[in-house]
Amino acid sequence: MSITFTSFLFEAAAATTGAIKHLTHLAGEEHFYGKERAAADLDRLEHLHRFAKGEKSYVSRVGIKADGSPAFEMGHVVNPATGHKEFGVAYKGASKGYAFNQKDLDEKFGDKPGLHSKLSQVLEHGKKVMSPLDGVVQGDFMGSKKDKTVFPEKGNRMSTKEQLIKYSIPADSEEGKKLKNSKISLALHTRLHGDQREYNIDTKKFEDASPDVHIFNNKLNKENINYTPEHQAEFQKNFKKAKEEFGKLRDHDGLVEGHSEHLQTYINKTVRDGSTPSPAGYKKHLGERLQKDVDKVKTFATKQKKQDHMDSMLHDVEEHKDQFHHLFNAHRHLDKAKNVLLDRLEMSGQNQEHTINDKQAKPEGFVVGYKDGSVSKVVNRSKEGFSGQNLNK
């Protein structure tokens, strides 16, 4: 089958770009999607444990997760309108298409002034740090002088704030001077090589490329991780208990079939309100959620179909509540094991002061890249942690 030259150019551009992937919570959600994904997640968690110990592991790099917005993609890709490689920017990956000029931005994002403005700034200044040889990178917009989200503060500090967390550094430090003189601040985290992704990229070559662009320092101070024998024992205790609870599941895949998305939504609810996950709590959440599906349809036949589905799902939870109990126990112990590692990463010392509503805060989390190309995020999923505060903001 033949294709037009323009279609070929669109496909060529797509081959070097890709939608910004959702990062899964390490030890937080994969067990709701079956035995195989749970086992892979356990393996990733154990290798982060080895990384923290300084042992050989499959972890390639750990970076600090930046609380910026919007997520973008930029680089030199083929412009279908000209047939040449040009610098362009895309919102949340290339799925919405690249903008190569202001006309493109107007057409794609003219109805969203805030987003249009930020992507326009990335388009204007991003090219100053990206050569055609740098390929395509993904990142987050951390602030700008134009939007007044890069600003000086008392105490001789320079700060950025786009989302929940405010980042602050001494104005007379090397990075502080760069931020003070910049027009925009960007956090770069991923480089694309065809359909391959390189996470937690080395951003050193971008940092001094242009005074107009400040590159957010998202490097982990690995040498400062103080992972003591006591911490290691606490991790191992909860890791072992989680595996024991998984071992009590008679049919892991069958248990979560049809429930995966609801379980994940329920866990977010418990993060938001600080409650402990339980079969009873899940059943209540599920009933309330499915009742909405029943209520919003009009015809008797459709309403009865939705009602039958709800009754079946709730019966399933009640009939297997002992198995859901083991699943939630495993979830709880995995979260505790993960939090031991998270605490050590958080205490390794950050490159910026983090505050939320002028109160000292910890980082949003960390991004862990593995040598097989997989990636996970490590985040405090308590009501008091970043996830809880972000869900409740």
For each feature predicted by the language model, list its residue ranges.
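Core nucleotide-handling region used for phosphoryl-transfer chemistry
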Residues: 11-60, 65-393
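Proteolytic processing junctions in secreted/extracellular precursors
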Residues: 3-12
